[in-house]
């Protein structure tokens, strides 16, 4: 009988894309793979093309602020634990891999109740609330950054691995990317990535600065679902998409500079591709500040140019783009020195070890 694994994680693309990299590896090796996510989260849409069983369970939001909805969330989480536990009793996987996000906690507890080993992964400098709550119930947690170790008591559960990267991102074709946008090689390209849900402040700033940007660059703009601007269709040197999936590798390959939020998974991929970049982290007023931590760390290394979201204006962005282009060679060398590579093989080995289908590693 083939070994089996259940993946969980969702809420944003950052809690799903590393799972996709791992899912493809396990399927290649003949494992039975299933996914547990929230009923209406982005993970269902992203996992669907992989053609694996998807199970939706109830989940709370794990908010850090007061809301009347917080009163209902404990009941949603308990229901999610019950649903997950029943699913695991039926599926009986050898191991569970959790990428975090609010759906992950009830799934992790459901696995623990069924005595199924759990491996979790944390992408950010400091762990999210779901992974903090899940930590007592996991066998191992893989961290992207060594700085995250201080937030956990049981150091024997921790492995610093990096982040899994979708293999296809590393095989992009520049000319295909240019053709997809109707561009040519006469001007460098800027790739603007606002995240899976889009970013209103980035979208507005790019569009207000479009005339100046397109005088020197060709602009590829991933603006988020439902956030295309019909008035800009056909503007020379500007191509907008709601979201890019299979074509993302080619769009990256076509780009000289990337403008992005500072989510750890996106940032790790940008670094692995060796792209000079500008980071615009989500404000701490609407997040736990993890993106600000990520951005500051790489800004301190002289690698990332950072603009705070509340200071984002057309003139500030244009100056940042000029700064990156002026220091491009220096930034290229600093990124190369990091030797960033995909953690897929490392994490696959840890998962197999916990599932007892591989001889324990010597670490």
Curated annotation (Swiss-Prot):
The keyword Transferase applies. This is UDP-N-acetylglucosamine--N-acetylmuramyl-(pentapeptide) pyrophosphoryl-undecaprenol N-acetylglucosamine transferase. Cell wall formation. Catalyzes the transfer of a GlcNAc subunit on undecaprenyl-pyrophosphoryl-MurNAc-pentapeptide (lipid intermediate I) to form undecaprenyl-pyrophosphoryl-MurNAc-(pentapeptide)GlcNAc (lipid intermediate II). The keyword Transmembrane helix does not apply. It is found in: Cell inner membrane. It comes from the Bacteria. UDP-N-acetyl-alpha-D-glucosamine binds at residues 12-14, 166, 196, 291. Pathway: Cell wall biogenesis; peptidoglycan biosynthesis. Belongs to the glycosyltransferase 28 family. MurG subfamily. InterPro entries: GlcNAc_MurG, Glyco_trans_28_C, GlycoTrans_28_N. One of its GO terms (biological process) is peptidoglycan biosynthetic process. Its EC number is 2.4.1.227. GO terms for molecular function: UDP-N-acetyl-D-glucosamine:N-acetylmuramoyl-L-alanyl-D-glutamyl-meso-2,6-diaminopimelyl-D-alanyl-D-alanine-diphosphoundecaprenol 4-beta-N-acetylglucosaminlytransferase activity; undecaprenyldiphospho-muramoylpentapeptide beta-N-acetylglucosaminyltransferase activity. Keywords: Cell cycle, Cell division, Cell inner membrane, Cell membrane, Cell shape, Cell wall biogenesis/degradation, Glycosyltransferase, Membrane, Peptidoglycan synthesis, Transferase. CDD domains: GT28_MurG (cd03785). Coiled coil: none annotated. GO terms for cellular component: plasma membrane. It catalyses: di-trans,octa-cis-undecaprenyl diphospho-N-acetyl-alpha-D-muramoyl-L-alanyl-D-glutamyl-meso-2,6-diaminopimeloyl-D-alanyl-D-alanine + UDP-N-acetyl-alpha-D-glucosamine = di-trans,octa-cis-undecaprenyl diphospho-[N-acetyl-alpha-D-glucosaminyl-(1->4)]-N-acetyl-alpha-D-muramoyl-L-alanyl-D-glutamyl-meso-2,6-diaminopimeloyl-D-alanyl-D-alanine + UDP + H(+). It is a peripheral membrane protein.
């Amino acid at each position: 009988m083939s070994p089996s694994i259940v993946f969980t994680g969702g809420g944003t693309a950052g809690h799903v894309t590393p799972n996709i990299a791992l899912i493809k590896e396990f399927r290649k090796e003949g494992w039975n793979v299933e996914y547990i996510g929230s009923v209406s989260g982005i993970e269902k849409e992203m996992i669907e093309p992989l053609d694996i069983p998807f199970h939706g369970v109830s989940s709370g939001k794990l908010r850090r602020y007061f809301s009347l909805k917080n009163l209902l969330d404990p009941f949603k989480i308990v229901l999610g634990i019950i649903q997950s536990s029943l699913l695991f009793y039926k599926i009986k996987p050898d191991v569970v891999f959790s990428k975090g996000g609010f759906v992950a906690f009830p799934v992790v507890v459901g696995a623990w109740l069924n005595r199924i080993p759990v491996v979790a992964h944390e992408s950010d400098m400091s762990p999210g609330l779901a992974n903090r709550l899940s930590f007592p119930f996991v066998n191992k947690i893989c961290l992207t950054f060594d700085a995250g170790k201080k937030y956990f008591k049981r150091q024997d559960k921790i492995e610093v691995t990096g982040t899994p990267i979708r293999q296809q991102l590393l095989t992009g074709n520049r000319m295909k990317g240019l053709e997809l946008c109707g561009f040519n090689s006469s001007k460098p390209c800027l790739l603007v990535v606002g995240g899976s849900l889009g970013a209103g402040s980035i979208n507005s700033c790019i569009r207000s600065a479009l005339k100046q940007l397109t005088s020197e660059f060709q602009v590829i703009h991933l603006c988020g679902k439902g956030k295309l601007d019909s008035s800009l269709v056909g503007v020379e040197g500007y191509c907008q998409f709601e979201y890019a999936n299979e074509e993302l590798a080619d769009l990256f390959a076509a780009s000289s500079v990337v403008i992005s939020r500072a989510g750890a998974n996106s940032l790790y991929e940008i670094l692995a591709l060796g792209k000079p970049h500008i980071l615009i982290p989500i404000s701490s007023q609407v997040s736990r500040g993890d993106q600000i931590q990520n951005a500051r760390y790489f800004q301190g290394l002289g690698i990332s140019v950072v603009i705070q979201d509340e200071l984002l204006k057309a003139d500030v962005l244009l100056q940042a783009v000029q700064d990156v282009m002026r220091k491009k060679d220096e930034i290229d060398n600093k990124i190369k020195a990091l030797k960033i590579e995909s953690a897929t093989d490392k994490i696959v080995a840890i998962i197999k070890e916990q599932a007892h289908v591989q001889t324990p590693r010597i670490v």
